[in-house]
Design a protein with these regions (language model features):
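Cys-dependent protein tyrosine phosphatase-like superfamily
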Residues: 1-91, 98, 102-109
Length: 109
């Protein structure tokens, strides 16, 4: 798991595993945002699996699936709301981290 810090309490990463969630909890993360649609890759865990594991550790989990190359206005608005209201530290992830970074930047405009 390679975390890229983009603000003091905001991080971006590539796909996380269910096993990473315990480590994220130990690091103090309070919120996870998944920007991958389910079934994008046959080897990725479904969001529901990530969410269930996150909740075991008291981590909030949100799903804003982005299908390249389009980021919808509603996705940006949802991200803006989460960034304003969700507890931090916060991690947003997708396959490589690129979609999460683009969505974050658009939400901060």
């Amino acid at each position: 798991m390679n975390l890229q810090q983009i603000e003091p309490d905001i991080f971006i990463s590539a796909q996380i595993s269910v096993e990473n969630i315990k480590k994220l909890a130990q690091m103090g993360f309070k919120t996870i945002i998944c920007n991958r649609p389910d079934q994008e890759d046959p080897h990725q865990p479904d969001f529901s699996t990530i969410k269930t594991e996150a909740h075991k550790y008291g981590i909030k989990a949100y799903h804003i699936p982005i299908v390249p190359p389009t980021i919808e206005r509603s996705d940006i608005e949802t991200m803006q709301t989460i960034l304003k209201t969700a507890p931090t530290p916060l991690l947003a992830y997708c396959h490589y981290g690129t979609r999460s970074m683009h969505l974050y930047r658009l939400a901060r405009l």
